[in-house]
């Protein structure tokens, strides 16, 4: 009976989706948005990127991250890069006017070029790195797919199964074979070496090796269930609507609602669903940005914000998978010699796609140590437990044993092992912290100690859930020491400072705002003073940068990077304004971000241009940096709206999960 009800509901969703597609086609013809940012689709197994200004897809990655594993020949490099199959994939002529948009705030991309329209999407229901392309009305318009591969085609052969005949392609320099399965009717093509021109619709599926071809064709045909390409598009949108949770916030505008829905999808796209294997342990990891953003690598810190956003939205399964990813990623503890000999589980920076710790991020080929990561991972675990009371996760078997024991022994203990006595309490040892300073410039950052305080607050409750009285007492004692040390080290003469060390760069620091939002600082005069000094970080684009940069050499990346407007700081400050009752100012800051996103496919970028340059070109206020941004973009926006609801309607109504899912479809 339940299956029958679900089936009828899906049929209804599909019929509605077909109407949405029809309406979108009409609207698309009359209301074409500016080209804007590149659009990305993904399904947790890979990514594809569409460039509206060129009318083509420009990337198809067979993995949901940028770097697969370390490069043994270059241990301090960013690693072995994920393959990309295509250079261009489209149907129009060079110079033709093109545009693209997401259909109904989904991951399905509809593009119009030269009077024809087509779809690109990676289906969540088919658990392989697969890209579906469908060109509408191709026989009537004469439009046909054209592809330029990103590497020389080495060989191709026919392969058949389940009544479908595909082509298996191999490329020079790419390990993964590419399987092509035709979906549309056969077209007569003369004088063309373009294989894709023979059909209006295709499935492009990356394989681990060619031996998978037959089984993947059968799997695909089972998933397809005989549906026409247009029906596959409609079903994908309908299934996505079933996955969504009911928002627990009151939107102030349609723009807010659309940005919430698109952000929800961005968070889903960003999470790896690749199964763990003997040499791969990245299932559940979340990248910091989506391509073409340069940060489509799993960062501990950004992932924490994305995880908490998913949890608070009601996406329990995705949040749980992210937490398990923290504890199953391996090998970790690579920098043990740099952290007082303490073994640890959570990476000190980020991860390769295979789940291995990557502590190398400064772009100069040297290592970083970011202790705040350990605090943020513990915060995410505590938030999840508070929302769902899922005690079973603490018993889950992970890389280093039961999850609770791994958290206690390989997060809390190494964190406290990397603290120093100060002012009768303790502070976290010098590191590179939230803004990823170069290791040679490490300092005692307020943010790292603040996140250690958050970690101990959370672990007090986690230990209580587990029934570990000794662990709870230790966490309480550590908490008291850290709070005392923080007050002595970072609040000096009534002013909150970003570092223990004196210096103009971090004297006022955008990271101080989330510290106050976390409730680490409660003195209203200190808060008022901090807000007043934030004027020193105001930039001409209208928002705030992270720090006052002290770089003097324009040849250095950070010289330009640190002079741009940083949206994570904007959203944090707007939240603080709202807490203090400055609601109109808070809403104005939020509305500005929402309006800018609405003009750019509801994509939230890392930054806005405040100082145009070659690295960050454009007009003042244009989106720049990594985009779409995930944890610091979609996640931060979602959390801001949830916090606004909490301030206006009470915590229980705002944060209680609604319509949660218990499995990841």
Model region roles, listed by residue range:
Residues 257-268, 307, 316-327, 375-385, ...:
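Hydrophobic core segments within long, regular secondary-structure runs in both alpha-
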Residues 37-82, 295, 350-373, 377-378, ...:
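C-terminal capping/lid segments that line or modulate ligand- or cofactor-binding pockets
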Residues 245-252, 265-269, 304-317, 365, ...:
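Well-ordered alpha-helical scaffold segments within catalytic/enzyme domains
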